[in-house]
C-alpha cells in the first residue's frame, strides 16, 4: 500500500469538506477549492480525518492513490492556512513595488516589467528587494512564483536576478585571467 496514500489527512476546525461525483471540495476561512479525482478511489471522513482508499492493488489504482491523497491534503491546507512563496531580488538597482494589484519589477531592463496576478493569487512587497506570492492553490502559487523568477533568472557568474529565498546558486568561476594578477607583457 502507498505510504503516502494511507496517511490520514487532519481536517482543521472551520474547514468543511465534500467528496462526490469525482470532485473534492474544501471550504475554509481563506476560500474554497475544488480538486477533481478519479472516482475509482474513495474519500471518506472519520473522526475529523480524511482517508483516501483504493479498491484494488492494480497499477493504475496504486499510481493514483498517493497523488490523490496529496492533492486533497494540499487543498485542505490551502483553504485553512494558505501558501506563501518568498522571492528575493539581488542586483544593483533591482527592486519591486506594487502598483494596484500588479507587481512592477525594475530589474535591469530598459523598461519596468509588470506582472498581473491571476485570480486567487496576491503579491506583497514587504521590502523593495523581497516579493511574497500568496494564495490558496499550491500549484498556482508555485507556478506564478516560477514565472516571476523566470523574468530574470539568477546570473551564473554573479548571482544577480530573482531567486527563491534560501535558493543556492552554483556560481561559475569566470575567466582565468580575471584574477587580478599581473598578466603577460
Curated annotation (Swiss-Prot):
Keyword flag Plastid: no
Name the GO terms of the biological process aspect: cytoplasmic translation
What parts of the sequence cross the membrane? none
Recorded hits in InterPro entries, A to Z, give: Ribosomal_uL6-like, Ribosomal_uL6-like_a/b-dom_sf, Ribosomal_uL6_a/b-dom, Ribosomal_uL6_bac-type
Q: Name one GO molecular function term.
A: rRNA binding
Task: Please give the superkingdom of this protein's source.
Answer: Bacteria
Show the GO cellular component annotation of the record: cytosolic large ribosomal subunit
Entry keywords, A to Z: Ribonucleoprotein, Ribosomal protein, RNA-binding, rRNA-binding
Q: Which family does it belong to?
A: Belongs to the universal ribosomal protein uL6 family.
- What function does the entry list? This protein binds to the 23S rRNA, and is important in its secondary structure. It is located near the subunit interface in the base of the L7/L12 stalk, and near the tRNA binding site of the peptidyltransferase center.
Q: Summarize the subunit comment.
A: Part of the 50S ribosomal subunit.
> What is the recorded name of this protein?
Large ribosomal subunit protein uL6
What organism does the UniProt record list as the source?
Deinococcus geothermalis (strain DSM 11300 / CIP 105573 / AG-3a)
Amino acid at each position: 500500500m502507498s505510504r503516502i496514500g494511507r496517511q490520514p489527512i487532519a481536517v482543521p476546525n472551520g474547514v468543511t469538506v465534500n467528496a462526490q461525483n469525482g470532485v473534492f471540495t474544501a471550504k475554509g476561512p481563506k476560500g474554497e477549492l475544488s480538486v477533481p479525482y478519479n472516482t475509482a478511489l474513495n474519500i471518506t471522513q472519520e473522526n475529523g480525518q480524511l482517508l483516501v482508499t483504493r479498491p484494488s492493488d492494480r497499477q493504475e489504482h496504486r499510481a493514483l492513490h498517493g497523488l490523490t491523497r496529496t492533492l486533497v491534503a494540499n487543498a485542505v491546507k490551502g483553504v485553512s492556512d494558505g501558501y506563501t512563496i518568498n522571492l528575493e531580488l539581488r542586483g544593483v538597482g533591482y527592486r519591486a513595488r506594487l502598483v494596484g494589484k500588479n507587481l512592477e519589477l525594475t530589474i535591469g531592463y530598459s523598461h519596468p516589467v509588470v506582472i498581473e496576478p491571476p485570480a486567487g493569487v496576491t503579491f506583497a512587497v514587504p521590502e523593495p528587494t523581497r516579493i511574497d506570492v500568496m494564495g490558496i492553490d499550491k500549484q498556482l502559487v508555485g507556478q506564478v512564483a516560477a514565472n516571476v523568477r523566470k523574468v530574470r533568472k539568477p546570473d551564473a557568474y554573479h548571482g544577480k536576478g530573482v531567486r527563491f529565498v534560501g535558493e543556492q546558486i552554483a556560481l561559475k568561476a569566470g575567466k582565468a585571467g580575471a584574477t587580478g594578477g599581473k598578466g603577460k607583457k
